[in-house]
Amino acid sequence: MAAGTLRGLAVAGGGESSDSEDDGWDIGYLDRSSQKLKRSLPVEEKNETFKKALTTGDISLVKELLDSGINVDSSFRYGWTPLMYAASVANAELVRFLLDRGANASFDKDKLTILISACSARGSEEQVLKCVELLLSRNADPNTACRRLMTPIMYAARDGHTQVVALLVAHGAEVNAQDENGYTALTWAARQGHKNVILKLLELGANKMLQTKDGRTPSEIAKRNKHLEIFNFLSLTLNPLEGKLQQLTKEETICKLLATDSDKEKDHIFSPYTAFGDLEIFLHGLGLEHMTDSLKEKDITLRHLLTMKKDELTKNGIASKDQQKILAALKELEVEEINFGKLPEVTKLEISGDEFLNFLLKLNKQCGHLITAVQNIITELPVNSHKIVLEWASPRNFTSVCEELVSNVEDLNEEVCRLKELIQKMQNERENDPTHIPLVEEVSTWKTRILKRSAVTVCGFGLLLFIGKLTLQRK
């Protein structure tokens, strides 16, 4: 394996790399059979072998080297300790072993802590969680920030580790801390589109109104990064989840947030956090968690729920107070409701031309809004199906609705053409009617034309007289 590649792997996820080109991690092939340790080996060779053992995760060789006298907190050329490297690659077994041998869990290099290295490690959430749990058990500070003022919870939220976020808060992490750009853990989760992390942070008391240094809230950050579902969810003013778990003790919080899982390894008590669907997130945001099971039993999707009227909600057994919350939320989510209720009643015989023209103008304006809305959706919709944010229904359902839309648009086109023909027919009949009296505008136009001609004639005569006088004076 190339040394350059492995050097890249040795850099912690927090992005705090060494300025030195030679970081001391020149990893080559390690043959245990040819690397039998002898206590008489020079210190330099022992250190080199130690680095290779850490890289390969060879715990037995690491143990043998430590037994031979190498310091567990040895600082290599770039300043990392063995524990920091093990945490940065989420090697929980190696982290446990080094801690048991007395490694310092609170060590930092240029404000990059071992806990931050673990929270930003490239590994499964299960392995990251194990490492974080071990470090916290050895009194690692969850609020120590790196040079960019990012705390461990921000790294965990950025990488979508819901359980890690919960565990850090349970151990005293400040949920609303801000980095050098004003980002909180919630802002980072919104930026990356981690909806489960967002839901958990709101339960833990995250303030969704805190702004970045350029004045953006988490919802605006989500919209900017095209996470529209998260933008809509965070835009809701109702948020009964906020601070829901803040009053619990540390032990109660851990038990509440992290359930046991008998299928997992015995040395790791935490089970993966259950993923929330769109319906669950919407209901949780309104404090209507109790409705989840009943709606699922009736096969009511979020898309269906969002289109229901009050009578439909009642038919489906939704209580009046719950209906009010849903309808209020839907009102906030509406971008622009097309309301034809205020259009004039054109069926009345007494309707004036102005009212009818006003009706046509409003109808045309509403059609323009519809065209713009569809164009915006086409622009924003991802080309790849796996990037679609609103997973409310299958693409087949979307296609079916689009087919109905096309049919309705064709019907509308036919009706508008009929209306145009009818108006044209009325206009022709009116012009051919001998009893037709010219409109006021027509009469005024005729009079105006005569006045203009008279004015031109008078000016012409005046000009001729003026020229005649000049000619006489010259003579």
UniProtKB/Swiss-Prot annotation:
It is found in: Cytoplasm. Disruption phenotype: Mice are viable but show profound defect in male meiosis leading to male sterility. Testes display increased hypomethylation of retrotransposons and their subsequent expression as well as piRNAs suppression. The keyword Phosphoprotein applies. Pfam families: Ank_2, Ank_4, SAM_2. GO terms for cellular component: cytoplasm; cytosol; pi-body. Signal peptide: none annotated. Keywords: ANK repeat, Cytoplasm, Developmental protein, Differentiation, Meiosis, Phosphoprotein, Repeat, RNA-mediated gene silencing, Spermatogenesis. ANK repeats lie at residues 45-74, 78-107, 110-144, 148-177, 181-210, 214-243. InterPro entries: Ankyrin_rpt, Ankyrin_rpt-contain_sf, Asz1_SAM, SAM, SAM/pointed_sf. Expressed exclusively in testis and ovary with higher levels in testis. The modification Phosphoserine is found at residues 17-18, 20. This is Ankyrin repeat, SAM and basic leucine zipper domain-containing protein 1. It comes from Mus musculus.
